[in-house]
């Protein structure tokens, strides 16, 4: 009986963990953005503009390139960065913890502050809208 309960508990925990990972990271960002009464949705256009906007020293495109379908290179470490656009890298934006971690780190590096929920949602919306035939200015 104990063994059956343990297996059932383990199965429930694994299901909960897989559902948590399957949740779209944009869902949590959307919930946070909705706390602002002026929020009316995310904008790919604003996301593209933020991607190219220079912060204190860099822009997102400094390391990630202007074309998010291509791999980038970290300016300081020289490490290769996989493409940001899901069309080139389907694993992008599939893990909410990673999305949160990297937005915190990169927004601080680029803008010397954390990005707002709207800014994060705008960037993800733009990156998800990029197709193989998209024209990137």
Sequence positions of predicted segments:
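Cleavable N-terminal signal peptides
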Residues: 9-10, 20
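Stable alpha-helical elements in mature extracytoplasmic
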Residues: 43-46, 59, 95, 99, ...
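Mature soluble domains of exported/periplasmic/lumenal proteins and thiol-rich metal-chelating peptides
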Residues: 26, 30, 69-75, 134-137
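Electrostatic cytochrome c docking/interface patches
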Residues: 23-55, 111
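C-terminal capping alpha-helices of c-type cytochrome domains
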Residues: 100-137
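Bacterial N-terminal signal peptides that target proteins for export
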Residues: 1-8
